[in-house]
Every structure is written in C-alpha cells, then in structure tokens.
Amino acid sequence: MKPLFIFGLGEIGKIVLRNLSKKEGVKLIGVIDIDPQKVGKSVYEITGIEKFKDVYVEKDAERVLKKRKDGVVIHLTSSYVKDVIDQYFLILDMGHNIITTTEEMTDPYLKHPRLAKKIDEKAKKKKRAIVPTGVNPGFAMDLLPIVFSSVFEEIKEIRVERINNASKRRFPLQRKIGSGLTPSEFKEKWEKREIGHVGLAESGSIIARTLKLKIKNFEETCDPKIAKSYIKTDFFEVNPGYVCGILHKVKIETEEDININLFLEMSLDAENPRDTIYIEGKPSLKLEIPGGLPGDESTASIAVNWIDKIFEMPPGLWTIDRLYLNHYFKKI
C-alpha cells in the first residue's frame, strides 16, 4: 500500500478524496489544512466518505508527514510558487513525492527561474519527484495540444480556445473572474493580479519550450466580459453593464514562425462551452470537446491518476517539457 497525504482540503481536495475512495493500493495517512472549522474533524465528518472515517484533519504539516515515509502528497493549496515553495521543501524533507496543482508550476521557469531551479535541485537531492498538474493549466490548453501536434508534418499555428460556463462553479472561481465588478474595478484588480485566471501565460510558454520554439514576442491581455442581461447564480447577482467574466488571451510569436494563440473565456452563463484546439499546418485539423472538460473534477482526477506513475519517476521537477511525450519538432 502506497502512503498518501492530502495537503489542502478545499473543494478540489474533497473531490480528490471522493476519487481516492474508489482506488486500491493506496492508503490515506493524513490530511493537512489550516481552516479551524476543519481541523480536528474526521474526513468522514467533512466529506461523508466512510472509508476515511479514521483519518482526521490536522494543522501541523510536519507532524502529519512524519507518520510515514516514501509516500506521495497531493498538494492543493495555492496558485503561486512563492506561496508554496516552503511547503514543497517540508514535504521533500519528510521523504515524499509531490503531485501539485499550483498553477504557476506548469512552467515555473517563466516567472520564477531561480525558485524553479531550487525546487528541482531539492527534489533531486532528496531523491523524490514533483509533478505539476491540473486541467487548466496542465492539460486542456497545453499538454493536449502538445500531444496533438505529434501527428503533424508541418505547423504554422497552434490555437486553443476554452470557453467555460462559470455559473455552476464554486464561489472562489466566480469571484476571481470579477463577477459583479464595474469595468474600472476589474481593470484595477487585474493590474494588481487580484483577480483573473492564473496559468495561461505558463500554458503558452510551456508549449513553446516543449516544441523547442524560441519566443520572439509574448503578449498577454485580460479584458472583462460585460453582462448584457441580468444574471443570478448561487453567489452573485450581476446587472447589465457589470462584469460577468474574463476574456483572457496569450499571443506568442516565435523565431520559427509558428504562432501560439490561447483564448480563455470564463464567464457566467457562457454560451456553447467547449474546448477547441486548432492546428494549422500539414494537415490542418480541429479537435473539439463539446461542453469542455469540467474544471474541478478533471483537476482532481488528473492529480489522483498521477499516483500510479510518480513512484516510477526519476527525482526532480517534472514539468511538461521534461515528460517523455511524442510531439512535433522543427529542429532538435
């Protein structure tokens, strides 16, 4: 039985536990969270999953992680590298592998090359693997088009569009897309990075790095989507003229004349939600997932399904460009 820990019991953490309850060969040893309303309670009390009735939520991460060695931690706490690096180091010092959903870790070398190098070196020193993952970033707008590229003889452009209906999503997500703000409030908060999606820039850069493309020009914009009619969700009421979502774009030009264009709409009552990959080249093809991949459920599943492989992986930080994937290349 492989020892398993959960670090962060938010909504995705609960879905991870539900997913884990159906798996064999792993044993949940501990759950870590700082929420006083959860600390001291059994996982069963919080999730209703009877299989984990003997596991309790604890605040002291070091105490929990010391219970067993040579395990894996599914890490679900923050979007930003600077917020999680100390948590990673503690986990590695305690002798565990890491599966993390921290969005910036999709390509930590983009904004935090020094910290990324430290994480990689620490993992190698401790002889453990750390795998960043998720559905977006981590799959829908980066890993999936990278793998899709392997069937192309030539590529001129990679274009990915994800349109996500946020009306039924959790409160933090509806808040982070600016629901109910005025356009000027949205602009101010986006400039401070207090709202918006984290990881689209990383998706673009990791596509370029994996395909060995040199970035010539990189542009990222995020505009508000304005409600045309009254919208009501479980958490927000948005009147016409106010913000109901984000229109987020990344445009990359490369020295190899292969353009990468990513577009993400996350909005309340978004019409025709879908994930679409267009690759122009030889041949030119379109891959579409009607309805789109469900964000929270898919993130939980992809994290859990990494457990099977992480114990076989060499030590170090395994970003997408280091995985042994077949993909398009123009030069080696």
What does each model-found stretch correspond to?
Residues M1-D93:
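N-terminal glycine-/serine-/threonine-rich beta1-alpha1-beta2 phosphate-ribose binding loop
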Residues F139-S150:
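Alpha-helical support elements that line or immediately flank enzyme active sites
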Residues N97-I99:
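A short hydrophobic/small-residue beta-strand
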Residues T102-R128:
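Rossmann-fold NAD(P)-binding glycine/threonine-rich loop
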Residues F7, E11, I15, R68, ...:
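Conserved active-site and cofactor/substrate-binding residues in soluble primary-metabolism enzymes
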